[in-house]
């Protein structure tokens, strides 16, 4: 669609430097109605001034939608039922938020009769892919405006200059020069000192977690109950998904849980450093795997585990709405029907580890079989035949090798 044909744009708006400048740029370049949409995914105080700021920067209409429960229930929980983790460290806090933002943005575009949507993701990053795959899933004909791929403001200083010229407040300061992205699952940090891969992230960067060495000297035990693979209660208290994750974030943050410093492989091909705080998610994943240990069949678990890296890549690369992710989700959800029980985890100075697990309804742990004491149900002599059959191919190979030496 030609620029002059665009009559109304819905912008995914965070209120940060990039999207504030994009809002003004869209008004200046397209001269049309621009509606901002901000998703409340648990950013906290960041959203407080966003309506006033959007109108002050030129927005014609402002949407601020509370999506916290939908975010955790329909996006975070399905992903955690899969134990998804990218490259062994990243719990996908940013990746899993983008599909929901894209979904709601496209709903607003339909309600408002907008012919274009826009986002603030750069042309170097993963988010441009995640947003736009979501857009096209809901409307294959939508016009997408990605300013970072179009404009000449190709540096942070150029953005600052544009902001000053157009009287846009600049939230980035010399004290906190890095960029951040926050939701109920995590907060991420990129840029500035983190572009030096040898430099340690400064302590004043962290928001959700205490430094482990400054965490309480006494450990805390937390019990998390699961039903069909979803966390439903903490220490016996039933909570909604968003309430539960927020509660675990607070507890985990007090004990320095969930800090990750990662050099990850972006979907566009380059490596990028990110520092993440995911206190509640770290506890949740540990507890979920503990309940699986006592309730999930061995072969089901091993098959599911073999698919986790692929599932995580789908989420990371923006394929949440893809048929392959939905197919894997159906398989994973089937495996979770027996994941009912309670895990007890111990939090202490940055560490979260399981110290107990139980299931009243679906435990596959049978003490009569597993005990090291005398039992009446397991004949240890039976193991001999099992071992001989399982070693047959190894014995044949050894005999063949010996014959070749003669």
UniProtKB/Swiss-Prot annotation:
Residues reported to bind L-citrulline: 90, 95, 126, 130, 179, 188, 264, 276
Task: Return one Gene Ontology term, BP aspect.
Answer: urea cycle
Q: One GO term of the cellular component aspect?
A: cytoplasm
Pathway noted in the entry: Amino-acid biosynthesis; L-arginine biosynthesis; L-arginine from L-ornithine and carbamoyl phosphate: step 2/3
Q: Which UniProt keywords apply?
A: Amino-acid biosynthesis, Arginine biosynthesis, ATP-binding, Cytoplasm, Ligase, Nucleotide-binding
Assembly and interaction partners: Homotetramer.
Protein name as it appears in the record: Argininosuccinate synthase
Protein's organism: Geotalea daltonii (strain DSM 22248 / JCM 15807 / FRC-32)
């Amino acid at each position: 669609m030609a620029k002059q044909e665009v009559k109304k744009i819905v912008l995914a708006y965070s209120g940060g430097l990039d999207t504030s400048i994009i809002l003004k740029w869209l008004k200046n370049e397209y001269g049309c109605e621009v509606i901002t949409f901000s998703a409340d995914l648990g950013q906290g105080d960041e959203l407080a001034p966003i309506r006033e700021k959007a109108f002050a920067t030129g927005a014609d209409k402002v949407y601020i939608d509370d999506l916290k429960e939908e975010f955790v229930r329909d996006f975070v929980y399905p992903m955690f039922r899969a134990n998804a983790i990218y490259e062994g460290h990243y719990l996908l806090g940013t990746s899993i938020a983008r599909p929901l933002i894209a979904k709601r943005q496209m709903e607003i575009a339909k309600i408002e009769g907008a012919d274009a949507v826009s986002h603030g993701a750069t042309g170097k990053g993963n988010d441009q892919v995640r947003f736009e795959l979501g857009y096209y899933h809901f409307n294959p004909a939508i016009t997408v405006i990605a300013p970072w791929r179009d404009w000449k403001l190709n540096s942070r200083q150029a953005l600052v200059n544009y902001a000053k010229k157009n009287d846009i407040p600049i939230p980035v300061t010399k004290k906190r020069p890095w960029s951040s992205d926050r939701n109920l699952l995590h907060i991420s940090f990129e840029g500035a000192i983190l572009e030096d891969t040898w430099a340690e992230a400064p302590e004043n960067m962290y928001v959700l977690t205490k430094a482990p060495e400054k965490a309480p000297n006494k450990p805390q035990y937390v019990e998390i109950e699961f039903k069909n693979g979803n966390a439903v209660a903490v220490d016996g208290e039933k909570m909604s998904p968003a309430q539960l994750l927020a509660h675990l974030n607070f507890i985990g943050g007090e004990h320095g849980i969930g800090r990750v410093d990662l050099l990850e492989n972006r979907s566009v091909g380059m490596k990028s450093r990110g520092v993440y705080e995911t206190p509640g998610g770290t506890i949740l994943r540990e507890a979920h795997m503990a309940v699986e240990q006592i309730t999930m069949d061995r072969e089901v678990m091993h098959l599911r585990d073999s698919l986790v890296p692929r599932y995580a890549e789908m989420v990371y690369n923006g394929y949440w709405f893809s048929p392959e992710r939905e197919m894997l989700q159906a398989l994973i959800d089937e495996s979770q029907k027996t994941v009912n029980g309670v895990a007890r985890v111990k939090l202490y100075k940055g560490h979260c580890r399981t110290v107990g697990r139980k299931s009243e309804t679906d435990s596959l742990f049978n003490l009569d079989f597993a005990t090291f004491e005398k039992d009446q149900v397991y004949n240890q002599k039976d193991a001999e035949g099992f071992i001989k059959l399982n070693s047959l191919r190894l014995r044949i190979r050894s005999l063949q090798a010996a014959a070749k030496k003669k």
